[in-house]
């Protein structure tokens, strides 16, 4: 038996090696769009004869045997699982004619000997304006019960990062129209921002407002990747986007965001790849010259899923049980998020810190890629100040006089100094009261309280709940307003005038209105 099998294996090996090494095969693999044949992977696989059979199923790991033409690593294989299309991604080559794959959906019901077809390309998903307002899963199938997606263009989820020559080297800030962010922790155009915050402090509302403002100010679109999040949260977000006007029900004109979900209940393969699916959709819009916002909630779940996949594939774990390829996996995702000469992808990533340990390898690896951090504080949200961004904890490498200009830098630092002084005086105020402070400190406290309130802002997406019309504030108006505050120009105005207004002119107008009402 062994002797008879040897001649069969040899041609398979000979055929597999040239197929992988042929230069002509490379462009097809890296091509950004798929041909008509590639869009019908089953037909293509049948034509090429790359049909194998299931040899072993261990949870999310499936071993598939091919007689010849072994599929390349990262190729998508397809099989029918009780009437549903099941996609497997090749992760390892075992011996001469077996591949080990990770399933993108449940393998319940899969049987040995079942036919599997090689699509000849990585997992490919639809891209284009047809994605706006829709929800897709990791393999590009709609999951919002709004009918099929009519996109005509498809892209593989594994793409190389842009070459150095394609990248834009100019440091620019992305003006969001949100005062606290633009002044104290400005976002880099094409940068990566870490969003830290507990439950109920306004992460979702801030994300919605950013999507709305980028669409208004830059005409850009947004992509939201839900990586290993709760199904309930994903469902709530979808409906909130419709209620707040960010998206139209069922997609179509007027929708500003595409949603890509791989929830907590999905197998690790889906959660490890859904971030790449979302990024592929975002890259299409960037290549069309757009400024794209790409949200990931939660980047920790991406690492966690990678760790599960690594263990399933039998790799020896690294520190704290994470995969040995942790930095490589993170880099492969993060390096694709950048500004090119065509457009930009600016990424806002919610980061869960396990056991509040910032030295844990998962968050520590993410921090290396971040340009800015936006910290949402419960103490600030309890004061009723929204967005509840902590002005002293949030940072940005863009807050540099060479990038934002000397005036912006000096005003931002003066605002932070005033708030820091107020923070250090709070213990004295709590114990002894305001009367025990010096006149200078009383003035600092009064200004700091006005600054705190002026950092609040009415949001467009919260209009339906608050009744206050949203405000999009120009950067120059923001700098002008806070400069006047720290220099004492508005010491005569009451604190209440600065709460939930846009520009300083709005605050002056509100003060006059309050004075008229009091009279």
Swiss-Prot record:
InterPro entries, A to Z: AAA+_ATPase (IPR003593), ATP-synt_VA_C (IPR055190), ATP_synth_F1_bsu (IPR005722), ATPase_a/bsu_AS (IPR020003), ATPase_alpha/beta_chains (IPR050053), ATPase_F1/V1/A1_a/bsu_N (IPR004100), ATPase_F1/V1/A1_a/bsu_N_sf (IPR036121), ATPase_F1/V1/A1_a/bsu_nucl-bd (IPR000194)
GO molecular function, one term: proton-transporting ATP synthase activity, rotational mechanism
Catalytic activity, reaction form: ATP + H2O + 4 H(+)(in) = ADP + phosphate + 5 H(+)(out)
Region (Disordered): 1-40
UniProt entry tagged with the keyword Nucleotide-binding: yes
Subcellular location: Cell inner membrane
Enzyme Commission code: 7.1.2.2
Topology in membrane: Peripheral membrane protein
One CC-aspect GO term: proton-transporting ATP synthase complex
Principal location listed in the UniProt entry: membrane
Biased composition (Low complexity): 1-26
Keywords, ordered alphabetically: ATP synthesis, ATP-binding, Cell inner membrane, Cell membrane, CF(1), Hydrogen ion transport, Ion transport, Membrane, Nucleotide-binding, Translocase, Transport
Listed CDD domains: ATP-synt_F1_beta_C, ATP-synt_F1_beta_N, F1-ATPase_beta_CD
Top EC group: translocase
Pfam families: ATP-synt_ab, ATP-synt_ab_N, ATP-synt_VA_C
Subunit structure: F-type ATPases have 2 components, CF(1) - the catalytic core - and CF(0) - the membrane proton channel. CF(1) has five subunits: alpha(3), beta(3), gamma(1), delta(1), epsilon(1). CF(0) has three main subunits: a(1), b(2) and c(9-12). The alpha and beta chains form an alternating ring which encloses part of the gamma chain. CF(1) is attached to CF(0) by a central stalk formed by the gamma and epsilon chains, while a peripheral stalk is formed by the delta and b chains.
Family: Belongs to the ATPase alpha/beta chains family.
Function description: Produces ATP from ADP in the presence of a proton gradient across the membrane. The catalytic sites are hosted primarily by the beta subunits.
Record-given protein name: ATP synthase subunit beta
Origin organism lineage: Bacteria, Pseudomonadati, Pseudomonadota, Alphaproteobacteria, Hyphomicrobiales
